[in-house]
Amino acid sequence: MRGFAGQPLKGIALTFGDRTVRGEAMVAAYGLEGGAVYALSAPLRDAIAAEGSAVVAFDLRPDMTAGALTARLSHGKPGQSLSNHLRKALKLSPVETNLLREAHGKDLPTGPGALAHAIKAAPIRLTGVQGLARAISSAGGVRLDALDENLMLKSHPGVFVAGEMLDWEAPTGGYLLQATFATGLAAARGVQAFLATPPPR
């Protein structure tokens, strides 16, 4: 897959365990990234830590049933390469075809039904996560039960926390920014309230 670094996988669905997310992924030199991968990052990270790896199923055509894919794949021209057949029948890009080969081996099934099922559930094994230096957002931080309602540390009165200082699975993009701004505002109001409260005598 490294030869396809920087190329997107658009309009896909990823399934891990009982959770399925739709979105995009990007092939990187070190593996996979992107919104759909980030949405599953917490359970994937935990599974990799516990088991050493995690298998994610890629559905490259989530808007089509296996039956619809089978019907389209049944009309190939004799002598046509499998890559060309997939491109013409389903508009599969070279990076998507390569992902199929990565998942199912170089010799993909040639029967329309088996090939359709391979496209609907391409298993990719993940063996690690990127380090904190490359993180867009991170997990871990100050536990919520260590804080009062103003985001002040119960053990250190006058110390307030916000944003990614908190222990929560932060989403990426605008959601993370909004949550950071909101908790920052809540902490600032907590600071004001703390400073306005006379110290105990």
What are these regions (language model features)?
Residues 183, 187:
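A glycine-rich phosphate/pyrophosphate-binding beta-strand-loop-alpha-helix module
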Residues 4-5, 13-162, 171-173, 178, ...:
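Residue-level recognition of phosphate/Mg2+-coordinating polar/acidic sites
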Residues 165:
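Active-site metal-binding loops of divalent metal-dependent hydrolases
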